[in-house]
Amino acid sequence: MPRRPRHTTIVASLLAAACLGAGGGAVAYATLHDSGTNTVVRQVTVQQADTASASPLSVNQIYRRAYRGVVEITVTEGGSASPVPGGGQQQAQGSGWVYDSDGHIVTNDHVVDGSTSIKVRFWDGKTYSATVVGTDKSTDLAVIKVDAPSSELFPLTVGDSTQLQVGDGVVAIGSPFGLEETVTSGIVSALHRAIQGMTNFTINDSIQTDAAINHGNSGGPLLNTQGQVVGVNAQIKSDSGGNEGVGFSIPSATVKTVASQLIANGKAVHAYLGVSIDSSAPNALLADIQANTPAAKAGLKKGDVITAVNSTSIATGDDLSRAIDAHKPGDKVSVTYKRGGSEHTVTVTLGTRPN
């Protein structure tokens, strides 16, 4: 079962904290993030570089280019309403990285979820309080903000995750188990993985890597061989609870879209079809239709098999989620499906994914 790597300890309690896990379900929910409302907040932090012709940097060169832009995040949870017996507070640590020179920092939603206070430690050991700008549970992303001087802020360059290839070198920087500025390296093991966010909605096109990712790495950057952020480290798949060489990062293409919305509006909107897919089926078989959703209003029913969205062929539930992911709320899409041996096509107006 996938686990989200956030290092957790208990303050004023003898209980050991449990690691956060990404729950699995019998069905996968077909939704999408809104890729059509991207607002660039700080153009300088989203540089488009021609990495195809650039020579790869060494791990040390990547580290020296990026380490000042990576932060350690310590959150305090609980208090008088704490679920910990005795009302003790729980502290947890994760990672993050500087997104722009306004002090915005990108991390995972599960790092800051439920926090009553957030402290950010920078490369020089200085610590600042942070506030939550916005969170998006369905993509497990969050933006927080610190009021720090410009001399403290070293925004990382965001690369293009769509240009990654299997076998490309990658580097992770973060604070596993509270060990700040830890560097691990590996390769892109696979692309286009579908992982689960903090809800049942899937995060499409996630990056699988064998670079060591452990508890505390959550929210830290995955960097390409040019030192550009191509992912946000989010989950590991492990039977032991530790690194086994199967980690997952949220792609930078998703990060740019969601982060810009969170900074501009405090929330991110995602298109929504309103169906669940039978994950045991070899195709995009509808296991359920949520009431009063775009799919229900268009007449789709349980047992229908989706075969196309517009001109995109659909063979699996992941294909359907990815196809919807290419649109935004309010878009009209043509959905082709099979029912009882006959093929039908219906126009669906996509809605907005519920929280």
Spans of model-derived segments:
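Serine-dependent protease modules
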Residues: 3-282, 290-292, 298, 317-331, ...
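Conserved catalytic motifs of ABC-family nucleotide-binding domains
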Residues: 303
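Short, conserved beta-strand segments of beta-strand-rich sandwich/propeller modules, principally
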Residues: 332-334, 345
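Short strand-turn-strand beta-turns centered on an Asx-Gly dipeptide
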Residues: 309-314, 340
